[in-house]
Amino acid sequence: MFFLSKYKLFLDCAYKTLNIIILEMKTNAVVDELSIGVEQNLTELAVYYLETMLTKNKLKKSSIKQFYVTIGPGSFTGQRIATIIAKSWCLLYPSCELYALNSLRFQIPYEHGISKISCGNDQNYCGLYSQTTSEIKLISKADFVKLCKANNELPMYENFENIESYSKLLLSNIDHFERIEDPLTLQPIYLKDPVN
């Protein structure tokens, strides 16, 4: 790899899996990717695998020009880690642009669908994405069933089950990520309220 090349970095820690993907800047070709289940030590593992992937591909941190991150809803720890790493990276490397997308939208591999992430206590985060609608709600399981029946033409995606490839998911959603001008304004969406 040439150290002058430019890259995109994707980090997702939202839901039971650590996902890191490096893309070539101009072509979006996948340079490297990692997807592993994580139960504990997410902070250490995220930093370790991120550093390992950069070293393995002989990339300097300054060669990352766009940082893509999912902001939840997701676990408290996962979302905090992802947003802190993304904010810190873009503050340390001001030429790196920050992009964010909620996990509900990210879970949908195509333009339209219903996305669900369970958060326990008979509650679900739900995203409805159609030609006319793009909304996120916290709803009961009963209301989720009603929503699916009322929109039965839309495919349903649940808890990141049956994901074939996170890099394909990233590439199909890359245009949905929103640019965050000020990294300090990046805020995660949690599955549950943090304990005070």
From Swiss-Prot:
GO BP: any one term: tRNA threonylcarbamoyladenosine modification
Domain of life: Bacteria
Coiled-coil region(s): none
Protein name: Uncharacterized protein MG208
